[in-house]
A protein has these predicted regions:
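RNase H-like, metal-dependent nuclease domains and their acidic two-metal-ion catalytic environment used
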Residues: 1-149, 181-247
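Short alpha-helix plus adjacent loop in nuclease-associated cores
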Residues: 147-185
Length: 247
């Protein structure tokens, strides 16, 4: 609130805003959900939302365009809203509810935008880590527990770094998640900007930052059941990189 760090995040309508939002909480107390464990702040709505992020790169893309920093929040299916007998075409959840595509002058502005997005929805972030901007910024700000860690496919162990890449097998997983989502749910999707990138995407994803961010949100949501953050929290606290601030 009022540009005060670590306070409540409140949305305001603006013609020059950086976010497209299709879902806001009806009651303010439902937003900014969090709790503390081992003196570390954790998001409190991880069963309802998950975010993905694709930081901007300094090099130009194939079309000679500077990439944007992108972010997306996916609203998971809520069984209390969309009961099992309800036809999928009538669901109100299981769709994207927030997107962001912008290239601020300062990379920390992008990092703070992604953090505030996650704080408002009370969700974790599965970031693109070819560029470790989001990961480092969340850690620096004391929001390490707002990051999602995947599992190593070969060992089955939790990965040492949060998020995922956009190359090799990781690209295939992003495309698989998008293919499934579009096949079953695209008719209900409210964010045309993200569907447009899905329509235009090719093998080179450099010009499609929102596609990557949304893909990471889908992948991250799928990994939540395999995300024992407690071990990572203990490791992080042991090294004592930063002070934590409670509100």
């Amino acid at each position: 609130v009022g540009d005060v760090r670590d306070s409540r995040v409140v949305w305001e309508d603006s013609d020059s805003g950086k976010f497209f939002v299709s879902y806001l909480f009806d009651h303010p107390d439902a937003s900014n959900k969090h709790y503390y464990m081992n003196k570390m702040r954790h998001p409190g709505n991880t069963h309802k939302f998950h975010a993905g992020g694709d930081p901007f790169k300094f090099k130009k893309t194939r079309t000679n365009k500077k990439s944007d920093g992108a972010g997306a929040v996916f609203m998971l299916r809520d069984g209390t809203v969309d009961h099992p007998q309800l036809d999928i075409s009538q669901w109100k959840t299981n769709r994207f509810c927030c997107t962001y595509s912008n290239r601020p002058k300062d990379k920390d502005i992008y990092g703070e935008d992604m953090l505030m997005m996650c704080v408002y929805y009370g969700c974790e972030m599965y970031p693109e880590i070819n560029v470790d901007l989001i990961w480092e910024y969340f850690e620096k700000r004391g929001y390490f527990a707002y990051l999602t860690f995947g599992t190593d496919r070969k060992t089955g162990k939790i990965q040492k770094t949060p998020g995922g890449f956009s190359r090799g097998e990781a690209i295939e997983e992003i495309f698989r998640m998008w293919h499934s989502y579009i096949e079953w749910h695209c008719e209900r999707e409210m964010h045309r900007e993200i569907l447009q990138q899905c329509k235009e995407i090719d093998d080179d994803m450099g010009d499609y930052d929102l596609f990557v961010a949304g893909g990471h949100a889908l992948v991250g949501a799928n990994k939540l059941a395999f995300n024992p953050i407690a071990d990572k929290v203990k490791e992080w606290e042991k090294e004592s990189y930063y002070d934590l601030h409670e509100i």
